Swiss-Prot record:
The keyword Transmembrane does not apply. Belongs to the TrhO family. It catalyses: uridine(34) in tRNA + AH2 + O2 = 5-hydroxyuridine(34) in tRNA + A + H2O. The active site is at C200. The gene is trhO. This is tRNA uridine(34) hydroxylase.
């Protein structure tokens, strides 16, 4: 029986990936469709992906599939053909190709079965996730941005919005998608006569969010097909102005794709213009935050003097201090002045 999970250490896999000479292509895709047996589907896809040397993160549930992956350039077309042939629901599926890609986004394949491909917190039995808003293409997005009756709603988390967003887009302040959905309905109650345009990184969150808004009585709802990634690609291909400003946060080692030259965020330590996310180098912290090169040198990649001092301690002493401590996978929320301690290199399903 084939091994259907990874048995090699992360460090060894990362070193192997970095030593590769063949270029890779970072791809994301999703599809809402019924999967009768997610576990069997997961095992079959794992074998298919492994045979093509695909790395990345894939989630499956009864409601569909959500994937962010890295594929050897020479295998991209074979991967596309085999994915399309795997299930009729996947035939012709749009694959979002990364905009700013060094091919080093992933080094291991992780494929998991979950209750939902996006953690939405919805338990309303009458909710119809297929009753989505209308798609918008790049030219239509730009037209909507100039429409005074249109409101753009960013359905990403606060740390994503902080480094980049559409002009005048509204932020729904939250740490997770499940928190955003009820807040979006609440914040838009006074604007039911407006055109609501929802967007996210690759389309998966705003598609479900558009259905949720319609379920809650909003009739004029649109969402951007393929999200920010597909919008920027099509706008560039068609010679249209790209109206997204800043960087598009992505959920892999790159942590961002440059969309425009503007830097709209600031270093969380000194306030200098900066939009580069990093994780605190202290193994007892790993806070996700924005740090400029000057502060990176000053604090040796750490988020504070305390973490800088702790990371310089002998490994055994660091382990002793970490024992029993709630640590790791924190995200700095500057707007709220607090940390969310439940997220990692953030999980795209949250």
């Amino acid at each position: 029986m084939p091994v259907l999970h990874n048995r090699i250490s992360n460090d060894a896999l990362k070193a192997k990936m970095l030593a590769e000479s063949e270029p890779r292509t970072t791809i994301s895709f999703y599809k809402y469709f019924h999967i009768a047996d997610p576990k069997a589907t997961r095992d079959a896809l794992y074998q298919l992906f492994t045979a093509l040397n695909v790395f990345g993160r894939v989630y499956l549930a009864h409601e569909g599939i959500n994937a962010q992956i890295s594929v050897p350039a020479s295998n991209v077309e074979t991967f596309r053909a085999q994915l399309y042939a795997f299930d009729s629901a996947l035939d012709g599926l749009r694959l979002n190709i990364a905009l700013d890609d060094d091919g080093k986004s992933f080094w291991v394949l992780r494929m998991k079965v979950r209750d939902r491909i996006v953690a939405d917190g919805i338990d309303d039995p009458h909710f119809d996730a297929s009753n989505v808003g209308e798609y918008l293409q790049a030219a239509e997005v730009n037209a909507m941005l100039d429409d005074p009756d249109a409101l753009f709603i960013d359905m990403r988390n606060h740390y994503e919005y902080e480094v980049g967003h559409f002009e005048n887009a509204l932020e729904i302040p939250a740490d997770t998608f499940r928190e955003q959905l009820p807040k979006a309905v609440e914040m838009m109650q006074a604007h039911k006569d407006k055109k609501i345009v929802m967007y996210c990184t690759g389309g998966i969150r705003c598609e479900k969010a558009s259905a949720w808004m319609k379920h809650n009585g909003f009739n004029k709802v649109w969402h951007i097909e393929g999200g920010i990634i597909e919008y920027a690609r099509k706008a560039r291909e068609q010679g249209l102005p790209v109206r997204f400003i800043g960087k598009n946060f992505v959920f892999d080692e790159r942590m961002g794709e440059r969309i425009s030259d503007e830097i709209i965020a600031h270093c969380h330590q000194c306030g200098a213009p900066c939009d580069s996310h990093t994780n605190c180098k202290n193994d007892g912290c790993h806070l996700l935050f924005i740090q400029c090169p000057v502060c990176a040198e000053k604090y040796k990649g750490c988020c504070s003097e305390i973490c800088c001092e702790e990371s310089a301690l002998p490994p055994e002493e660091q382990r002793r201090r970490r024992a029993g401590r709630e640590n790791g996978n924190k995200i700095f929320n500057k707007s709220r002045g607090r940390l969310n301690t439940t997220l990692g290199i953030p999980d795209p399903t949250e």
